[in-house]
Each structure stands twice: as C-alpha cells, then as structure tokens.
Amino acid sequence: MNSLGFDKAPQDTRVVVAMSGGVDSSVTAALLKEQGYDVVGITLQLYDHGLTVGRKGACCAGQDIYDARQVADRIDIPHYVLDYESRFGQSVIDDFADSYLRGETPIPCVRCNQRVKFRDLLAQARDLGADCLATGHYARRVAGPTGPALHRGADPARDQSYFLFATTPAQLDYLRFPIGHLPKSETRALAERLGLAVADKPDSQDICFVPAGNYAQVVEKLRPGAVEPGEIVHLDGRVLGRHDGVIRYTVGQRRGLGIGGRRTPEGEELDPLYVVRVEPETRRVVVGPRTALARDRVLVREVNWLGGTDTADVPVTVKLRSAQPALPARVSLTADGGAVVTLTQPQYGVAPGQAAVFYQGDRVLGGGWIVRAEASPALADAPIPAGAGTAL
C-alpha cells in the first residue's frame, strides 16, 4: 500500500494536483513528485476580476498561473491551464451576488469547492486517468470502517475543514490532502528545501474575484441597479439614518453603521448598536442592543451529512463562522434536507448565508447553510447577563 492508499507502486499511481500557484499546492505537487508518483498539475483560470473592477492581484490572477507553471517546470511535471471562467461565474459569482442581495453573508470559497473544484475538476481528473485528485488544503482524510472521514487539519491555525463541509462521500473517496498533517511553517520549510520559487509567497487574503475586500463594488457591477438605499431603523421603530444598500451590512455588525451614538468624554461608545437583521424586501437595516442578537436555535438548509445513520439529537460542536471556535450543540436533521441546531449557550451575530459545520472531536460530521437563527421561548423570556455568550 503506497502513501496515498493504493495497492501499487507510486510510479504506477497517477495523481492530478490542483495547483493554485500558492505555496501549499506547490509543495503538494513537489512532495508527490519526490515520492515517485505520476503527477499532473492543473491550474484553473477562474476569473479575471480586472474585467469587472479594473484591478489586478488576487488568487486567480495571471501571476498565479505563471507561478504554478514555474513550479511545474521546476519539478518536471506536465501542467495544464483549464478555462473555467464561465462555469465559475455561473456556479459561484452569480450565487455570491444574489446571496448578498437576499441580505445574506455568503462564503464563495465553499461554493467553489462544491461546484467547481470537487465536481468539475474532479471529473476532469478522472478523464485523465488519475487515481485521485490532490489539493493543498489543510484538512485530513482518515480511513474508517465505512470509508474515509473528513477531519480537521493538524494545525488549528490553518485548518480548512470548515470550507470543505459540502464534500460528498464519493468525492472524499477520490480526494487526497497530502499536507493536511503539517503546520504551515513546515510547508514553507519544505518549499525552501525543494527549491520552489513560491516559498516566500504571501498567502492570499482576498476572495479571488473581490480584490481588496471590496465586495460591494463587485456586487454593484454584477447587478447594476439592484443595490438601493434605504433606512436604518431601531427595533423600537425609530428611524436613525439611511444607508446606501443592504449589501453593506451583516448581522452582528457594529462598526461603520454611520448613525452616531452617545459617547463618554474619552470617546467610548455608550449603548452601542448592532445590526440585528437585514430586510432586503423593505430595504431596511434593523439595529438594536447586543442583547437583541442572542440566539440559541439555528435553522440550516442544504445539509451534507457525513455522520452515518445517527441523524436525530446528535451531540456535536458547531462552527458558525470560519474563524470562530467550535461551540457545544445538538443537531437534528429534517425531512426537507435541512437541520435544526440547538446551542448550549446563546450566540450573538449568527448571520444567514454563513455555514454551520458540525464536528465530533476532529471529525467533520457535515454542515449546511444558515437560513436564520432564533431565540427559543426559554431564551426569549430569560434575562441575559451583560457580556454573556460569544460575539461572532
């Protein structure tokens, strides 16, 4: 059995590596080549955001394709660039824009993995006769009695399992994550040892089609005329100000509301207000005190369940945002393909459009998209101590 789990020699095992031009996927390809595998590199041309916003410099830019090709030449593997712009636009970018217009806060990287990399690219890898598709994700694929399971990456600071929750069992069977057991520092050290020019390349910080994080500009260009001004309204009905479009607000947001407020002589905000909900139909942004954000019940749709036959009242920990710690909860699947998540402690700022990802220990049991969060009757009637719960 070789290191990728196949009962044949590495040189007889063909591996397609998804090469983004970054250090993680470059090290993945180089390590597999060093181990003797038949490696083929593929880079996806997903989006030229310069056509939309007139700027350069994010993970899908031409420089990254050049970097991937340089690495492929260095380690002497075939390398192909596939034009996936059209399918990426339809499957990811349009969904991103429409999600914001619905008052949600989307995660396009999950949709990209779900609808492009692990669907279309995986099919392309099969067409090339590959035994598996390898990526540079910091996640682990662990063999189990009923098939492979998805686990967190070994480095908590780099774990990307949250973004992979939609991976199906069939996809997971074909995927490999060769650096999922490494810390990032070791990945960069390997890049240095292997002589890869990308060893010191900075990690991408932006969504590839949203340069400098200006997602509102992208949505406005993709959906001209759809972003309309409206009112900022307090829960008690007072109109506190106006906004330039609900796409600029997310549940739990405190800064940048532009409605002023009382402050201490030292400048500290008194009675701060938070976005409690976004109403795209009325074009209203509703704000209130932090206590109004308390929620302990989360409704989820499009659940991908990797947890086997247990589907009712399953004890889990759940992440409601990628950078948030996992929280104790219980989850029950529903007949419509969704789930109800009951939190042990109320949370503040649970945003529709984000993902709820379920874990048992390091294992990913699945996840889905947050539709809305609610306060149970018990929570709604209970006084909430100041500072209780976790701010998202």
Swiss-Prot record:
One of its GO terms (molecular function) is tRNA-uridine 2-sulfurtransferase activity. It catalyses: S-sulfanyl-L-cysteinyl-[protein] + uridine(34) in tRNA + AH2 + ATP = 2-thiouridine(34) in tRNA + L-cysteinyl-[protein] + A + AMP + diphosphate + H(+). It comes from the Bacteria. This is tRNA-specific 2-thiouridylase MnmA. The gene is mnmA. Transmembrane segments: none annotated. Its EC number is 2.8.1.13. One of its GO terms (cellular component) is cytoplasm. The keyword Transit peptide does not apply. Disulfide bonds join 112-208. GO terms for biological process: tRNA wobble position uridine thiolation. Keywords: ATP-binding, Cytoplasm, Disulfide bond, Nucleotide-binding, RNA-binding, Transferase, tRNA processing, tRNA-binding. It is found in: Cytoplasm. Its main location: cytoplasm. It is an enzyme of class 2 (transferase). Pfam families: tRNA_Me_trans (PF03054), tRNA_Me_trans_C (PF20258), tRNA_Me_trans_M (PF20259). Catalyzes the 2-thiolation of uridine at the wobble position (U34) of tRNA, leading to the formation of s(2)U34. The record marks 137, 354 as: Interaction with tRNA. Belongs to the MnmA/TRMU family. Signal peptide: none annotated.
